[in-house]
Amino acid sequence: MTNHLFELAGNRKTENVIPKSKKKWYQGKPVVSAAILILIVLCCLCAELIMTKDPTYMDLLNYNKAPDREFLFGTDTMGRDIFSMIWYGGRISILIGGLATVISTFIAVVVGAFSGVAPAWLDELIMRFTEIFLSIPTLLLIILLQAIMGDANILSLSFVIGVTSWTSIAKVVRTEVRQIRNSEYIIAARCMGAGFFRILWKHLVPNFFSSIMFMVVMNVRTAMISEATLSFMGIGLPIEVITWGSMLSLSDKALMTGSWWIILIPGLFLITTVLCLTNIGNACREQTNRKESNF
């Protein structure tokens, strides 16, 4: 009886074990978000080919008009065609997000890398300053700096948003640099007389860029939201500069007249773009965590 049980235990069938199928290239990747984001960006870049009317023209005979065949997305309180404004203004919103992210990433990489290779006392000083800067509300800093710089324009607003959103990336860069600063290739580059920026570009950036990629993507999202928030509050770009944020600044008048499309359509495009960037950023973070867990 015992031998029979051992025979049964040893003769388990293995034919039913299904080999793991190969993972599809698109699985685990934000394909839909990337496709939607690319489509929105391309449409904004090709706005002149898509626009049905002049986005700056104020047709006072057709203000607050609901969507129809002539005005696909309706008109705003000043009679401007919202369909044309979406694509025309989207370029500026995306441009501000991109410029602000480039500025914040550059500052973060330089400050974080310098802190990572600096002596302990200087590293401590830089990190304490970074933490103090990080503790101040970002929106308050943006408003203060913009007030100092004067009237807002695309460049000044991008600069102000950029110089107030570098701290989180800088801390990650500093941590990564401190882990590799005593590597043989870094020491060899120093011995050969390479300067800080050459070592940073040639040796340090390739090692930590994947770790901050998701934060860079998230910064684009944050910059676009900041621009929209400032425009909504009436302290961003002038009303004649069309962006998704400036379109939303007319929401108070739209609510009074029941013109829901003035709020819904720009808000929908802004939220869709932000969600796509969020999904892409989360995918970058998961990819980075997966790579780090394999080591």
Regions found by a protein language model. Give the residues of each.
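Transmembrane alpha-helical segments of polytopic membrane transport and secretion proteins
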Residues: 1-38, 279-295
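Generic alpha-helical transmembrane segments of integral inner-membrane proteins
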Residues: 34-46, 98, 102-110, 114, ...
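Periplasmic/extracellular loop-to-transmembrane helix junction in inner-membrane transport proteins
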Residues: 18-23, 53-101, 250-267
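Generic hydrophobic transmembrane alpha-helix motif, especially the helices
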Residues: 72, 76, 116-117, 122-179, ...
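C-terminal transmembrane helix and the adjacent membrane-cytosol boundary/short C-terminal tail
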Residues: 164, 217-220, 259-295
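Glycine-rich helix-loop "coupling/hinge" segments at transmembrane-helix boundaries
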Residues: 147-149, 177, 226-265, 269
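Transmembrane-helix boundary motif in ABC transporter permease subunits
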Residues: 48-50, 96-130, 143
